[in-house]
């Protein structure tokens, strides 16, 4: 009997979710992730409340064994002695619109947990409680229903029978894919020098997976010279390992679109060389780049009343998947756009939903490493994932940027000006935050005055801030460094973070109430900037430092991640193995340290190209500085032509 691993949330949402994509209730995150609110409510529930209870069970339906797994938000026994399964949901839906039957998925999730727990504990009945936390008002609304064990069992069996045809589709495809990959041949007549060695290293890493010594998965750093065909040298052995049962899905992660294209081209070559190859792939692209119905400013408008592709998305997506999964497919950006138009669904969300049914997922680093946009459907728990990280020399800087945040005081001033005259909750919050940053700017200047030798030391915007008898109202902690209007602190001042957090709720309300306003895009940008700072503050620890910089009337606040190693390590630990490769990964000790892979194997392949073929020429009269590049293009082109032309 075939076995299918199925997360409980995925089961209920796939079958029961209906309606439209609506960013008003799902796209913003004022509460700094639902998990933060969950922890708050769980802590307040008392000692008898079991939080985040892991539940799993094997159930049979339609000749398929389903391995169901999930975490109940809470389980406790009430004052009557009845066991209660608590399902916590954060929502931006107005309190008056929160009803008992608002979302059938919520009841279904609690009922499945209840079915598992009742069977395991031999309970004849129990209660399921929905706890809604309204993030604007901090209001808690609860609904309770009682179910017998038989009712819960029948409900779960019904869900599994409904899902069985989809599970059977997955089972049949997995068998076909495994057989196909087992017969996969290298698509060229012979390996280039260095290709076989690289392929062998990656194949062995994928096979090894998680071991007693590598509980976070086997890690490999591979430095290979440009020109040997690294993309195929990575993809081919990883796919062969999958064909042997060593890996369920392959994620090819890149820093640039050009390397995504290289991965797509390599897969196309494999299909061309072996037309019967059963392998599906999807390329994930940022929502802003694939949106088919942007607003006047060019931003996605993910509201059912504004976007026909968002309206009714969940009512149409299963029909789209049914049609698209009938054959082998490579769903690149163009293919997703065509399919989205055909079925009238959002291309971005379609790509995400297709990724669950594809064998290879190609995308930017952020789909694994970014704490905001990573693929929660895969990486909130570990799985048999194979990670190929291309151009890995770019990852340290990208990772630091993903976990850091930057905010400028001027964005508050400009937002107040954009709102015009009149009083509002938003303007009040903006004014308080602006004042807090103004005081921080004064404190910054006092702690780290400009050197008088500098040309801009007499900037009136700086010197006029602090009359002799005036001190800033905000006192900064002892700095790590203070010079030239720049201050580094071990911790971010709470006097700055609190008023910035307070801007989020009224700003959210304004954005939802004024979607067509001329300044909507400007205030949306402010919202995301505040959100980034709040999120960075939430994960702030000893790996961060705070930088305050005063320039003229500006104050820049940065929460800088200096060492992304623990965050990268945690991301990679979601998978079975990870191969990070590039032409430049030296010294390996640095990359292993900064990427949290201190015990990883590191190999450097010799260049297959004769050393005498290297030509090194110095042209000091051509500037390649960024600001000079456009003016230097012709000179660089002429020089390349001159030195590569036959003499």
Regions found by a protein language model. Name each.
Residues 176-221:
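Conserved pre-motif I regulatory segment
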Residues 178, 185, 246-361, 369, ...:
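A substrate-engagement module of RecA-like helicase motors
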Residues 232-245:
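Walker A/P-loop NTP-binding motif
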Residues 341-356, 372-378, 510-623, 632-636:
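A contiguous, basic/glycine-rich beta-loop/short-helix subdomain that forms a polymer-engagement track
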Residues 643-647:
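Conserved small/polar residues in nucleotide/adenosyl-binding loops
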């Amino acid at each position: 009997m075939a076995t299918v691993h199925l997360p409980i949330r995925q089961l209920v949402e796939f079958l029961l979710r209906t309606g439209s994509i609506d960013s008003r209730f799902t796209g913003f995150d004022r509460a700094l992730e639902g998990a933060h609110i969950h922890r708050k409510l769980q802590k307040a529930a008392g000692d008898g409340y079991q939080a985040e209870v892991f539940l799993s069970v094997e159930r049979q339906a339609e000749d398929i064994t389903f391995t169901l797994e999930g975490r109940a938000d809470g389980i406790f026994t009430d004052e009557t002695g009845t066991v209660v399964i608590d399902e916590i949901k954060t929502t931006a839906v107005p309190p008056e619109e929160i009803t008992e039957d608002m979302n059938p998925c919520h009841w279904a999730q609690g009922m499945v947990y209840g079915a598992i727990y009742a069977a395991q504990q031999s309970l004849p009945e129990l209660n399921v409680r929905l706890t809604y936390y309204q993030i604007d008002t901090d209001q808690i609304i609860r609904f309770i229903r009682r179910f017998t064990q038989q009712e819960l069992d029948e409900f779960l069996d019904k869900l599994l029978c409904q899902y069985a045809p989809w599970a059977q589709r997955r089972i049949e495809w997995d068998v076909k894919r495994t057989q196909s990959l087992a017969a996969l041949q290298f698509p060229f007549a012979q390996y280039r020098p260095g290709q076989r060695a690289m392929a062998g290293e990656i194949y062995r890493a994928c096979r090894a997976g998680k071991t007693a010594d590598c509980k976070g998965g086997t890690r490999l750093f591979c430095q290979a010279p440009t020109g040997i065909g690294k993309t195929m040298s990575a993809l081919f052995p990883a796919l062969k390992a999958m064909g042997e049962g060593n890996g369920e899905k392959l994620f090819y992660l890149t820093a640039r679109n050009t390397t995504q294209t290289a991965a797509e081209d390599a897969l196309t070559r494999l299909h061309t060389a072996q037309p019967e190859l059963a392998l599906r792939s999807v390329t994930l692209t940022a929502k802003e780049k694939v949106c088919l119905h942007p607003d006047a400013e060019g931003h996605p408008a993910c509201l059912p009343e504004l976007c026909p592709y968002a309206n009714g998305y969940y009512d149409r997506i299963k029909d789209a998947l049914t049609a698209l999964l009938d054959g082998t497919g490579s769903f690149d950006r163009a293919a997703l756009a065509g399919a989205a138009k055909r079925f009238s669904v959002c291309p971005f969300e379609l790509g995400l939903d297709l990724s669950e049914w594809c064998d290879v997922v190609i995308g930017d680093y952020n789909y694994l490493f970014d704490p905001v946009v990573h693929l929660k459907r895969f990486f909130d728990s570990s799985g048999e994932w194979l990670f190929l990280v291309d151009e890995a020399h770019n990852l340290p800087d990208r990772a630091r940027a993903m976990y850091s945040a930057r905010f400028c005081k001027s964005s508050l001033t400009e937002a107040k000006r954009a709102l015009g005259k009149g009083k509002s909750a938003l303007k009040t919050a903006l004014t308080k935050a602006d004042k807090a940053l103004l005081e921080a700017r004064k404190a910054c200047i006092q702690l780290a005055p400009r050197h008088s030798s500098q040309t801009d030391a007499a900037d009136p915007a700086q010197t006029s801030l602090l009359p002799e008898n005036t001190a800033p109202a905000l006192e900064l902690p002892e700095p790590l460094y203070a010079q030239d209007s720049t201050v580094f602190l071990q911790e971010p001042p709470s006097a700055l973070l609190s008023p910035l957090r307070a801007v989020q709720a009224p700003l959210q309300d304004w954005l939802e109430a004024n979607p067509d306003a001329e300044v909507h895009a400007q205030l949306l940008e402010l919202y995301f900037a505040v959100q980034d700072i709040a999120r960075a503050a939430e994960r702030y620890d000893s790996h961060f430092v705070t930088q305050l910089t005063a320039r003229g009337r500006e104050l820049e606040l940065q929460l800088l991640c200096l060492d992304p190693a623990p965050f990268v390590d945690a991301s990679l630990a979601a998978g079975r193995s990870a191969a990070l490769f590039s032409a430049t990964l030296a010294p390996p000790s640095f990359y292993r340290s900064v990427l949290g892979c201190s015990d990883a194997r590191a190999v450097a392949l010799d260049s297959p190209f004769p050393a005498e073929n290297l030509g090194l020429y110095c042209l000091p009269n051509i500037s390649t500085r960024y600001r000079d590049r456009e003016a230097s293009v012709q000179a660089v082109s002429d020089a390349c032509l001159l030195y590569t032309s036959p003499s």
